[in-house]
């Protein structure tokens, strides 16, 4: 099992496969894993063709491995929708792939909304998306600017 070379966000589709191969996985309530946020990190960089290309390739990988992820498909759908919103919020208005990402969110949002263990922020974004993706983006950008 290897992380794909040259892709951004490469841990997303691979970590789930790694967890499924483990004999035992332990969860605890402690926050023991931290991302180091650097000023030049992927998270802080503006939207680019490399981000889009990586995002599209990762979505292809996700679609190909859904059959092995059935035991955890709800959490995987939630993570996928979070990832799609993350990239969607960074895309320029009118960008051709916005519709592709929005359609993928539409296909998965009921799964996320009906999953009581799904991330609250993602469930809220899915709910608001029924009123339009522009509204979701406006609300979440406002929340981000006031650090909510």
Task: Locate predicted features.
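Conserved nucleotide-sugar donor-binding catalytic segment
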Residues: 1-48
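Active-site catalytic microenvironments for nucleophilic, acid-base chemistry
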Residues: 21, 87-90
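Structural motif
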Residues: 68-78, 116-123
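Catalytic core of nucleotide-sugar-dependent glycosyltransferases
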Residues: 30-39, 44-70, 95-112
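Amphipathic alpha-helical repeat scaffolds of TPR domains
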Residues: 75-87
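Charge-rich, low-complexity amphipathic helices
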Residues: 18-19, 40-44, 55, 84, ...
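Membrane-interface aromatic/basic loop that binds lipid-linked glycans or pyrophosphate carriers
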Residues: 93-148
């Amino acid at each position: 099992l290897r992380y794909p070379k040259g892709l951004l966000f490469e841990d997303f589709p691979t970590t789930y496969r790694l967890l499924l191969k483990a004999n035992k996985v332990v969860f605890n309530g402690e926050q023991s894993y931290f991302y180091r946020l650097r000023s030049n990190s992927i998270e802080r960089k503006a939207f680019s063709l490399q981000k889009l290309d990586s995002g599209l390739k990762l979505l292809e990988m996700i679609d190909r491995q859904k059959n092995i992820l059935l035991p955890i498909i709800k959490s995987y759908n939630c993570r996928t929708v979070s990832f799609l919103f993350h990239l969607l919020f960074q895309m320029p208005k009118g960008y051709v792939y916005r519709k592709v990402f929005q359609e993928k969110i539409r296909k998965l949002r009921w799964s996320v909304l009906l999953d009581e263990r799904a991330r609250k922020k993602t469930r809220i974004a899915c709910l608001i998306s029924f009123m339009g993706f522009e509204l979701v983006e406006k609300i979440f950008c406002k929340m981000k600017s006031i650090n909510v």
